[in-house]
Amino acid sequence: MSRRYDSRTTIFSPEGRLYQVEYAMEAIGNAGSALGVLAADGVVLVGEKKVTSKLLQTSRSAEKMYKIDSHLACAVAGIMSDANILLNTARLHAQRYALSYQEPIPVEQLVQSLCDTKQGYTQFGGLRPFGVSFLFAGWDKHHGFQLYMSDPSGNYSGWKAAAVGANSQAAQSMLKQDYRDGMTREEAVALALKVLSKTMDSTSLTAEKLELAEVFLQPGTGEVQYQVCSPEAMGKLLAKAGLSQPAPEA
């Protein structure tokens, strides 16, 4: 039945479904997992790298975590070429707002603007939906720390803890069970690593398979800080959480 209605994004099925949008969400389900946890003093993002071959030369740049503005970052799950287009669009929105109003763009306003773009690709002929989901982490003076999730349909919503990518339903269930209000960033990191260790396809967690980023306020100055965890620091975090063995000393 679906084959009659899935050739174009502008055609609803008799059940009221847009199959191309659903197929885009299926593409995200095959991507590496990404988690976001909202803490009292920041937001934590953790992502799983998909290393397809040991011959692949991994770049120094991030694969799952991206900075959009000084107060806003995101984790990505899905088709990276699609994500790059949307990331550039988001950065352009942020810079235009800063140029016009001389202050950082509110987090939800940027998320809504980007989701309007994504929604447009589900409504007009000759286009296909973006096969990517985002977890946005940021801070602004209006609502403090915030975590948003968006999908290919253009929908977005605010979350205390969220997961996208492979095994996201299992991860979401664990987050719902173990999350509590008022967590510190350190506790949020431990929770995210614990959930990822139980839902990843890989048998064991290693620093090379993970990316971790945090958005928090710098002590003293109160400025928003975006920080990416180094592989060395990631290894120590995994060892501290009891999720991997520390490397033997030479």
From Swiss-Prot:
Keywords: Cytoplasm, Nucleus, Proteasome. The proteasome is a multicatalytic proteinase complex which is characterized by its ability to cleave peptides with Arg, Phe, Tyr, Leu, and Glu adjacent to the leaving group at neutral or slightly basic pH. The proteasome has an ATP-dependent proteolytic activity. The keyword DNA damage does not apply. The 26S proteasome consists of a 20S proteasome core and two 19S regulatory subunits. The 20S proteasome core is composed of 28 subunits that are arranged in four stacked rings, resulting in a barrel-shaped structure. The two end rings are each formed by seven alpha subunits, and the two central rings are each formed by seven beta subunits. The catalytic chamber with the active sites is on the inside of the barrel. Its main location: cytoplasm. CDD domains: proteasome_alpha_type_4 (cd03752). Coiled coil: none annotated. This is Proteasome subunit alpha type-4-1. Belongs to the peptidase T1A family. The lineage of its organism: Eukaryota, Viridiplantae, Streptophyta, Embryophyta, Tracheophyta. The keyword Nucleus applies. GO terms for biological process: ubiquitin-dependent protein catabolic process. It is found in: Cytoplasm; Nucleus. SUPFAM superfamilies: N-terminal nucleophile aminohydrolases (Ntn hydrolases) (SSF56235). It comes from Oryza sativa subsp. indica (Rice). One of its GO terms (cellular component) is nucleus. Gene3D superfamilies: Glutamine Phosphoribosylpyrophosphate, subunit 1, domain 1.
